[in-house]
Amino acid sequence: MIKLLCKTTAILSIALLYGCASAPSPEKMQAEVANYTLPKPAVADKGLVYVVRPSNVGMAVRFNVFLDDKEPVSEMGYNRGNQYIYFYVTPGQHVISSKAENWSDLPVTVKAGQVVYLKQEVNAGFVIARNTLVVLDDLEGRYLIKDGALGTIEKESK
């Protein structure tokens, strides 16, 4: 019983420390992405959206990404831990939705030729992981994509 308690305490301590890790400095991120090219480039007549899930917490749970509504035909793809997806959008106002235990909706305005970076933050859920979508700046977006793996892309545009 004591061994089990010690193991559980050790695992929870590691998880707590992992969750408190901070992002590297902007200087370090800039140095690491200086010569980095995005896997999919922007195009002149459309916007490009990258959705990244940099955390490995709850990686067995997939976070599905939808464009403009929550219908199955609007699913653009999904991420598991440390993955990203991308898709093109027509310029204008869109709502990106991410589904885990909950729905997280984020309205974004995308211009032609612009790249928008969104992060799926992992939160503790009642049964499975919950999520929150947040907008990233260009530097942090490129940094997180550089270190991620490609998720599952259902479609590259809608």
Show where each model-derived region lies:
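Short loop/turn and low-complexity linker motifs enriched in small/turn-promoting residues
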Residues: 20-158
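Sec-dependent bacterial lipoprotein signal peptides
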Residues: 1-22
